[in-house]
Amino acid sequence: MKNAWIIISFLVIYTSTTAQTLPLKQEISLRAPSNIKLDGKSTEWGDKFQAFDKATEVFYTISNNDENLYFTIKVKQPRVIEKIMNAGITITVNNTGKKDDEATDNVSLTFPLMDYSNVPRIVTASGAKTKRIMVSAGRGTRPTDYEPEFNSTPSDSLKDVATKLLKANAKTIKIKGIKEIPDGDLSVYNQENIIVGAAFDHTGVYIYELAIPLKYLRGIVNQTRFTYNIKLQSRLNVLRPGMVTSYNYVGGERVSADLDLDSTTDFWGEYTLASKQ
């Protein structure tokens, strides 16, 4: 048992140290690897990232080639993964350098978004369930504990189940601000060459990749410094049937037990396209 605690302590310290050695924002421009593949894996990067944002608890790397801008995101914390499965990650790019959620020239893309009935299944199978998940069958019905239809003991095979469930149910990307594409839901199997890749690895870590063709980003060219925003949406922004907020009573007052899921967290950064060497 003593050895087990030593191993666990080492893993916690290693993870914390890794995050602490990274900058809060990416500081350099990067050419995307020639073998980049949006499959929900970070193997082409050697699982190394350029920054770690403490507010969102997101590791990330931004890169580009002559055709696309790429975002590669890694999330380790189970509760943060649950938040993402509930409401998605929104990535916003502004080619004029604004850091304003309401800027009219923002381009934003949100993924994943899916029917809520699939979220508890994915969260449980991935190992991201940290406490009871309440679900509702509809208005006027009493919320009940989610009971998985499978043995939820963590295992490599269940992580595969989580990835398969995610791919089977997260079928659209929410688009806003691209002149050539109407605002709204775009199929992940689109002809506009906007590509997403997402998966859970064998430890339950979530990897999300996004490719945006530069032609949709309105004039971003080499040496142009632009701004980006990575946002973990609040569940309250995407309310769907079946969602339930749990409450605790503190000093006689009702307090949400899911403030982390019901709060938006985000950060802004700046990036310049990397030129071909």
Locations of regions flagged by a protein language model:
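Sec-dependent signal peptide cleavage junction
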Residues: 18-33, 269-277
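Beta-strand-rich interaction surfaces with strong enrichment in secreted/lumenal proteins
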Residues: 49-50, 58-61, 194-200, 258-260
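Bacterial Sec-dependent N-terminal signal peptides
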Residues: 1-26
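Acidic, glycine-anchored loop motifs typical of Ca2+
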Residues: 37-44
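Short, well-ordered beta-strand segments enriched in hydrophobic/aromatic residues
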Residues: 40, 68-75, 206-214
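Long, compositionally biased interface segments
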Residues: 221-277
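Surface-exposed, glycine/proline- and aromatic-rich loop segments on solvent-exposed faces
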Residues: 49-166, 232-240
